[in-house]
Amino acid sequence: DNKFKVSGLIFGEVWIKPLEEKFDLDIDVSLKNGKYMDEPFDEMIISLLYKNDMLHIDDISMTKQGSMGMQINGIIPTKKDSKSKKNIIIESNFSNLSLEFIHRFIPDFFKIDGRANGFLKIGGTAKKTTFKYDLNIKDAMFDAIKLGNIKSIGEYNGKYLLVKEVVSSTNNNNIFGKGRVPIDFNISSTNMGSFFKSDSITFLTKGHLEKLSFLSPYISDLDSLKGDINISLNLNGPMSNIDKSGKISIANG
């Protein structure tokens, strides 16, 4: 699994204490000039303790001087017990984090790219994971669409990604979206990053544009369409058979 592969010059200590059917693990290491999931870094720090079926993350951080930084800390219960009520508590802050790097963890999701700043707070359980996020993204790309600068806030409830707001601004084109997407982001899932195809999406997008060049990857003739343009697009229905509707009005075209 590539998620557990990391390269670089390593310094530090790893302490393991075998028990009857368990073990305690204490890791305090630093890696220099390496790669993780094909993302280069100047330094990665891993400081964590595994004991009594709990993973305590003091610090997992990855930095590339002048261009990227990411830090994670918290607690993850690892015991596979349906009666366990111990929750995940994870917080992450990041700056100039590559969304292409994030996409490698969820390859079945739409292609995404750009540089993200913000935070992510994860809770719930491994079986039913929840999180909240607040993101600002530069030079964003979703699928084949260039979206410029994006701000988005939302949360995940174990079944739906609830996008409270996503705002895109590029070249005097402004787009607003909100809705819910049925997708599996549960940590213990073997299908993490896949859509729940039997569940329904509800997503509304509105925009005020000067031209429709952002849609030209799909319909090339739209690239030359200019004016005072208002659009609305709706996605509804099961992921296996999405109903798409919308309207466009153009003035001074």
Q: Each predicted region: which residue ranges?
A:
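Interface amphipathic segments
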Residues: 1-119, 127-253
